[in-house]
Amino acid sequence: PRKPAEAYLRLRTLPGEQSQVDWAHFGHVQIGRAKRALMAFVMVLSWSRQIFVHFYLNARMGAFLHGHVAAFEAWGGVPRVLLYDNLRSAVLNRRGDTIEFNPALLDLAAHYRFEPRPVAVARGNEKDCAA
């Protein structure tokens, strides 16, 4: 017999309250003799599900920060809370409830006045838009 599915409440947010951030891998591209990863920075507004996508040839911190700024400029504003799926660009270390954010992300958050918030480990239901 199949194990019963766990029930979840649908996430409800207000306009401008929250967005969800992640990287997506889109295979590789050939540039000259080099084969490079094609990465998409993805930010989704939780309330409207409006999506922002920007492609990069890596998933380094500079691209991660640039993706945030580009999304904020495209939308003409900054969500109050940004959810992260414990990706290394955002969370350097996590032990229980103790979270060490990447200092560069904290600097960006302080400048743009948003709250970075990681979702619980292995709880994809907490971040249902950009997964």
Language-model segment annotations:
Residues 1-51, 59-63, 67:
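Mobile-element integrase/transposase regions
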Residues 49-54, 90:
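Short small-residue beta-strand/loop micro-motif enriched in glycine and branched aliphatics
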Residues 53-81:
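Active-site beta-loop-alpha junctions of metal-dependent nucleic acid enzymes
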Residues 55-56, 93-98:
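Short, solvent-exposed loop/turn segments at secondary-structure boundaries
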Residues 80-84, 89:
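Substrate-binding beta-hairpin/strand module that engages nucleic acids
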Residues 84-85, 95-96, 114-131:
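RNase H-like two-metal-ion nuclease catalytic core shared by retroviral integrases
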Residues 98-116:
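Two-metal-ion acidic nuclease core segments, chiefly of the RNase H-like superfamily
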